[in-house]
Amino acid sequence: MGYFISELTYEELAPLLTEEAVIVLPIGGGSKEHGNHLPMGTDYFVTDYVAQEVTKRCDVLTLPTLPYAYFPAFVKWKGSVSIEHKHFTDYVQDILLSFVRFGVRKFLIIDGGVSTHPPLCLLARDLDNSHNVKVAVSDIRGLAAETENELCTQKQGGHGDESETSTMLYLHENLVHMDKAVEEYSEEFPNTIVNGHRKIYFSSRMNTLNGINGNSTLATKEKGERILQAMVDSICDFLKEYIPWMPEAED
């Protein structure tokens, strides 16, 4: 079992900040459109839940969930907050370096976004080279991929879809408006994705009428429970190896 840093006193936290410690930073958008049926804080709710469950099972020190990040595909949707990617990575770096200066060398970012993943991975590489610390970054597209493939029948998805709606039905059913759930799919530029494989990167924004990509009408609470459990299990499986492991000392 781990600890939530915000619940500890300074006297309790200070001796835990060792070279062997793993600091967890969850990141999930707290104000980002998810269609007309899901709350703006969907990413935050899901990421925060996963972080809480991981902390209950693993010997980690978990920071409060960061609710604002880099979400450029949603800047045209009212109320959706996006932090410019350089500001975002600088901010996250400052958070991590606040612990590096006291000897911590291992971090895990629980990343609840898609657009946040590339800049966070670049930051992880930079900190490895500059400070010899390891920053692992979870990938929301892969954490529960096998379970989603088993349970979900939508032809494609990615935002406010069958999977995401299912997780919110499990976590906060009172915030989900299934009477407004729809099936709609965002359009990709021709020949950038072929047979499910991305061939060419092509910048795009959320372009559907209701702001989702997938079939949210197929969502169920039962699917959501299993998908969330798979996310937690994937991270805990990684942490079993990561917690006892130490980065090599520099020459």
What are these regions (language model features)?
Residues 1-108, 114-251:
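Extended, histidine- and acidic-residue-enriched regions that form the cofactor-binding/catalytic faces
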